[in-house]
Amino acid sequence: MQQLLSPTISYPSPLFHLTSHPFPPKPHFCPTHRLSFYPPPKMASFSGFLAKSQMGMTAAAAAGDGANGFSSLMDYVGKGGLDVGDDLLVLLYHIQFACKRIAALVASPFNSALGKHSALTGATSGAAASDRDKPKPLDIVANEIILSSLRNSGKVSVMASEEDDAPIWINDDGPFVVVLDPLDGSRNIDASIPTGTIFGVYNRLPELDNQPTEEKALLNSLQSGRKLVAAGYVLYSSATILCASFGSGTHAFTLDRSTGDFILTHPSIRIPPQGQIYSVNDARYFDWPEGLRQYIDTVRQGKGKFPKKYSARYICSLVADFHRTMLYGGIAMNPRDHLRLVYEANPLSYLAEQAGGKGSDGKRSILSIQPVKLHQRLPLFLGSLEDIDELESYGDVQQKVNPGYEV
């Protein structure tokens, strides 16, 4: 248990190694077996110092506890920082490892053919091998990467994913349940629009241990958002950013590609009480209920409780729109019952509340809703506390009519 795990361990791989390329990129790999984990030694990085200086820190403050000049994700949540506990630390290590691999796949010019390299089950013959050679959608590949990483962690009993019809029972002894959307916004990849991974972590419910496997897997996955012990998202954009909360604030870490570390760049994020931005597809304005139309008309004329004209900013990528809202305030919303409570609404609402904001379905707090179905959908409004409260005061803001459009 005293052996340190180096984050720079690599293994041979068929991915991205083009013989004509003089400098093949070094890919990220999931560990292939359960690992005893302690935070790795700190590594020096120029970009780490640069990030600190851009945050307005002095040279002395940027030096931190060591000589490296930055705090990595694993340092920050380990025994010298938040001390989230050994089990959660190991789980987080495997989640961030998987997300680095997804980031590489999303950014790769070869991602349209990556499916044939992505089979993680070890099957080598017959129909299974034939299926493995067929390209898969990138969201399915991402789902397989995360499932493999969670299995290797040894810390997860159940994984429930937006990509699977039913939750997957992984390990009888795993202390955690993980719910996730492996690649939100995947339809945007061809246009290089930001995408993201969303995840939530619950404690396994030991009172269900004697139930049939399918039943206990489902019930463990249908916990209220109030029972989350951790949640986060990873934004794949011009930078790869992991934003997470462990019940003591919301913190964002940016991937330093020179070292492979997620570096703390936004500690203790606080969503402004009011913003000046709303994010919604307002081409659907005439499908909205009267209350939502009145709210949007009011704030963009500067006649709301915050006497400034609001601007519209809409990417049509939930993680990207929410990340901007976290930093600048305002509201990111989808007023129709489109987003999934378990995989998207609960984790993001948890992050919003930990940052001083709010998640709502237009009438009540998202985290107060008890899920009754695994793929349950609902409207979602995320953002500044006072903006959400003002929105709810308009009454009916949930879209009832879905005319059949996809986005």
Model-derived segments and their meaning:
Residues 1-30:
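N-terminal chloroplast transit peptides
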Residues 40-113, 140-407:
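IMPase-like, lithium-sensitive Mg2+-dependent phosphomonoesterase catalytic core
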Residues 108-125:
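Membrane-interface helix-loop junction between the first two transmembrane segments
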Residues 117-118, 128-132, 185, 338:
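Short, surface-exposed loop/turn segments at secondary-structure junctions
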Residues 120-133, 141-148:
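N-terminal, Lys/Arg-enriched amphipathic/low-complexity engagement segments
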